[in-house]
């Protein structure tokens, strides 16, 4: 069973810079791919650029390489979901004259997938991988030499199988997070005072969300 938990963590200025840059890169990648979908004919593409095409075609692009590979792919996938929703609404008439996905003016959240997250059972710390190009940029531009991001919160101790971590743009030394994690059964729920509701959420599948 998948659950989600929203929380926040305090971060150092160096971490704020790194996370902020990733959120900026994600918004730029979204806009590049969105422009391509809006204007694929003018760009000379033979067919409409779907997620499978875009995640490969932009793999060497600047903004893609400033993100962990799976995070960049997930950004492209979220755009793909937005376009699919637009076409469904257009076909079914669910909304009169629906608008296609918009370009992002501000930084957007980034999603770490399981392979980019290191978590020891019972630990209150997560270790997140950073892409090589981003590390080089941070070193050369800001003198920041972080190899990984380490986020700490006591709620991580009870999460044995973390599947995704959605990180929001930092503000005032804090960063909001949504943690998607797996539990093996429902018996644990009777002890934690949580209730459940269906939430399509920020992930690519329907999951159960836990609220305090």
Q: What is the role of each PLM region?
A:
Residues 1-209:
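Nucleic-acid substrate recognition interfaces
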